[in-house]
């Protein structure tokens, strides 16, 4: 529970209540949602409490906590996992790791308030080496094979992406075992998507056991002749781990044509930030060998990729 200025204006403050829920995630299992409103010292009021707002649009962002003694900034950190499969993931030493620290800010759009959750600026000190890549106009695909080789699977990709107005433009990260994670803009659907169905080890998701409450929801939907919500809300659903998550591009500024993406890749996670954290998306991945290849690709038109950089990270 904390205060944030709206659009950086300290004369216009709002209170934010975060809530870690299990189940209830848009894609199944656990997640963090938030509510923005006013607090008089006793009562918290939120005028749009029925609108679900996710702090992160991936499936592995839970147990978010914020810190004291950070000046006038609000910094948070999350646990990267989901209780649907937290005890099934192929970790040997732990049950998941923390995500990168993030700075939370509040912005207003069309009369409603939303949190942007960008990586904290201190994280950039992890950059060790930078490769500046040439701008690319892509009509099909451009391979950057081995661009992240010798980075031990820990690197950051930055780019300004201008998709075709009705097409798909994406960045694929992969290894030489044909395992890949795809991040793409689907402009016709108005979504940014992260697909981990072929990211590496995924079959453990077949053993996932949803929460009893979620199973009750499934039963109710089945009686109506419908599939479980976690399946219909996901894209390319294979099992409770092998799927794609997505976020609406309406969270970004209206009329946007170019989107800034910042992708942090580690040995078992991919964290995506779009337009300064207006969209954040965190997902676990378990490739059997480190990702080291990048491919720019499009469908249904040409896309521009500019200011493209790959940073080796000291993680």
Predicted regions and their residues:
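Structural motif
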Residues: 26-36
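Short catalytic/ligand-binding loop motif for oxyanion handling, primarily in non-cytosolic enzymes
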Residues: 24-27, 84-86
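Short, well-ordered alpha-helical packing segments
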Residues: 2, 16-18, 34, 63, ...
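Hydrophobic core segments of beta-strands in well-ordered, beta-rich domains
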Residues: 2, 11-23, 73-80
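Beta-rich accessory regions
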Residues: 10, 38-51, 55-59, 63-315
């Amino acid at each position: 529970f904390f205060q944030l200025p709206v659009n950086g204006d300290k004369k216009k403050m709002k209170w934010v209540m975060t809530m870690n829920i299990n189940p209830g995630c848009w894609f199944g299992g656990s997640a963090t949602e938030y509510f923005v409103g006013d607090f008089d010292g006793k009562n918290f009021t939120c005028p749009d409490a029925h609108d679900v707002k996710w702090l992160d649009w991936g499936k592995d962002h839970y147990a978010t906590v914020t810190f004291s003694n950070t000046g006038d900034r609000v910094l948070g950190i999350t646990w990267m996992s989901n209780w649907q499969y937290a005890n099934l993931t192929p970790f040997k030493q732990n049950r998941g790791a923390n995500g990168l620290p993030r700075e939370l800010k509040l912005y207003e759009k069309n009369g409603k308030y939303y949190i942007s959750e960008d990586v904290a600026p201190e994280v950039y000190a992890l950059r060790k080496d930078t490769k500046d890549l040439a701008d690319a106009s892509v009509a099909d695909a451009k391979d950057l094979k081995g661009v992240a080789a010798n980075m031990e699977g820990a690197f950051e990709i930055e780019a300004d992406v201008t998709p075709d107005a009705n097409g798909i433009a994406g960045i694929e990260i992969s290894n030489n075992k044909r395992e890949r994670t795809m991040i793409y803009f689907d402009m016709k659907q108005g979504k940014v998507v992260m697909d981990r169905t072929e990211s590496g080890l995924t079959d453990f998701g077949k053993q996932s056991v949803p929460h009893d409450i979620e199973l009750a929801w499934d039963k109710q939907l089945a009686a109506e002749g419908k599939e479980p919500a976690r399946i219909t809300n996901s894209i390319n659903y294979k099992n409770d781990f092998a799927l794609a998550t997505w976020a609406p591009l309406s969270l970004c500024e209206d009329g946007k044509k170019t989107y800034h993406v910042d992708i942090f890749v580690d040995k078992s996670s991919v964290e995506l930030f779009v337009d300064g954290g207006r969209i954040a998306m965190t997902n676990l991945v378990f490739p059997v060998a480190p990702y080291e290849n990048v491919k720019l690709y499009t469908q249904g038109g040409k896309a521009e990729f500019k200011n493209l950089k790959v940073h080796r990270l000291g993680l």
